[in-house]
């Protein structure tokens, strides 16, 4: 509880909402989607999104893109295309709004949070891989990677390619943190270990990038 209290004192409500949004990207898409939609509705109802859009230069090009893309999808009865357009619009609105509220401390906190979370993803992913080996009757220490979707490592993301994408993002974050840490050998070693752990997990996902 004290930790949550410290967070409330350190960050504003909008910054905490941004942190939670970044945290929610670790959820499966069917949980992430409703969360982003609820945040989008909140920003519209509170008029915070409208104010942010008015203060954003060249925003008319975003409206034009959404209008053209949505019109083409509707004309061709492409429901998925229309939903994808709306999804992109919602994400851009959130980015435009939160750009006003992010600062260095918020950015650093989000990066560290995701790096720590990646360790938990890896632990669960290794457990999941052992379960796959057990189901297939394979020795647990063969480190064999399979191509079939049902035999690929997903961790908490329910999709191997999405997990691989998140690992690649975490790799960039660890490199950034490694080069920005000054005079702290233990922290530097920590980032190196986490980096190699995630590269190993990237290989185990079976993604081409691995």
Go through the PLM ranges and name each one:
Residues 19, 108-141, 155-210:
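Alpha-helical transmembrane segments of multi-pass inner-membrane proteins
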């Amino acid at each position: 509880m004290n930790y949550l209290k410290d967070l409330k004192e350190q960050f504003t409500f909008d910054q905490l909402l941004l942190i939670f949004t970044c945290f929610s990207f670790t959820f499966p898409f069917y949980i992430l989607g409703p969360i982003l939609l609820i945040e989008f509705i909140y920003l519209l109802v509170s008029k915070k999104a409208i104010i942010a859009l008015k203060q954003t230069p060249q925003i008319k090009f975003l409206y034009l893109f959404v209008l053209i893309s949505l019109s083409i999808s509707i004309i061709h009865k492409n429901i998925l295309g229309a939903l994808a357009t709306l999804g992109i619009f919602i994400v851009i609105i959130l980015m435009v709004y939160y750009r006003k509220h992010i600062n260095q401390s918020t950015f650093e906190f989000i990066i560290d949070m995701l790096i720590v979370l990646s360790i938990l993803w890896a632990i669960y992913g290794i457990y999941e891989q052992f379960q796959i080996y057990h189901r297939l009757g394979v020795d647990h220490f063969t480190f064999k990677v399979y191509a079939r979707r049902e035999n690929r490592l997903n961790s908490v993301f329910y999709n191997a390619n999405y997990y691989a994408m998140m690992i690649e993002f975490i790799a960039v974050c660890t490199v950034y943190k490694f080069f920005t840490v000054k005079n702290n050998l233990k922290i530097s070693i920590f980032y190196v270990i986490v980096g190699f752990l995630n590269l190993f997990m990237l290989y185990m996902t079976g993604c081409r990038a691995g």
